[in-house]
Amino acid sequence: MTTGLIILNYNSSDDTINCIESIERVNTSPIKYIIVDNGSSNPYIVPKLNDYLKSKFASKHILLNENDKIPDILPYSTLLVSKNNTGYACGNKKGLKLAYHDKEIDTILIINNDVIFIDDFISPLRRWLWNDDKTMLVSPLILKRDGETIDPNCARRKKTYRYIIAWFIFIFSDIFGILRKMQKELFIINNNEIPSQNIKIEMPSGSCFMVKKKEFKQIDDFDPNTFLYYEEDILSAKISDYGKQCLLIPTYTCIHIGGSSTNKRSSNFIFRTSIESARYYAKKYLKVGFTKYIILYIITSLSLITHIFKNYFYKRIKN
């Protein structure tokens, strides 16, 4: 059987190409690429990416538009072109739709396009995943851009209502280091020491993780109601409700460059999106009551106003 690699591309074909090149250098496991262009606004992105894939994989590559008929069996490489940027969750769902259709794919690896493979970890992660009935999701240890520092986001505890409230209160001024302390409590790995054994985690990094296709489909994979942020929190809640766990395999590593897609969006848009996702997550998955939700709504609204004014005055001073 085969692992389907779903890579989301948005205005960053160079990152996607670098990601694929890194995989091709080290991987020895049977795979299929499903690259989703998530409505790139730059008209040169899709042609450049498609030309690269055709040159690299020749007849083993196809280009699909969003409404094209899905082949029963996908080739080695598929580039799916989406008309609109629908965000992380919905963009990946488009790739998952293709993977679900292909009976040769039994395992799915979700990868950010700014991830660089340094280890041949697909086969080992598959073994860990399929040999443990309690586990639905596995992830390698993820390093930051420098290739040495551990990205603590790869092993986290789930965000609580208290944490979300504190985040939006102290994000502009972390009085007494309250937010920093709460963030430290959120991270399972804080000392940059590589763990000697596998770690059960509540929340993985969305930049690189592996799941069993059938189980991922059963929990309805990503929630389409978020555009950006809180996708991992929601995924963690779904997996927990299903009675399964997430596992970090620290023996194998990859590098996450970070910020490739979000840097191409305005600061106000990103902040507003994070607020919408936080409200949705708190209401549906943390199941907060009416009073707690109103408190969250007021605090996030004030935080957004502060953010907009701060950006406005910063631009005025800069100009």
Model-derived segments and spans:
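Glycine-rich, basic loop-to-helix element that forms the pyrophosphate-binding segment
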Residues: 81-100
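Short beta-strand-to-loop acidic/aromatic patch adjacent to the donor-nucleotide binding site
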Residues: 104-116
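Active-site-adjacent helix/loop segment of glycosyltransferases
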Residues: 6, 143, 233-315
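Conserved donor NDP-sugar-binding/catalytic core segment of glycosyltransferases
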Residues: 116-154
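Short, flexible, basic/aromatic active-site loop/helix in glycosyltransferases
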Residues: 158-201
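A short, conserved alpha-helix in the catalytic core of glycosyltransferases
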Residues: 193-253
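A conserved hydrophobic helix/loop-capping motif in glycosyltransferases and polysaccharide synthases
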Residues: 3-15, 19, 26, 36-39
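Short, acidic, metal-binding catalytic loop of nucleotide-sugar glycosyltransferases
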Residues: 21-31, 52
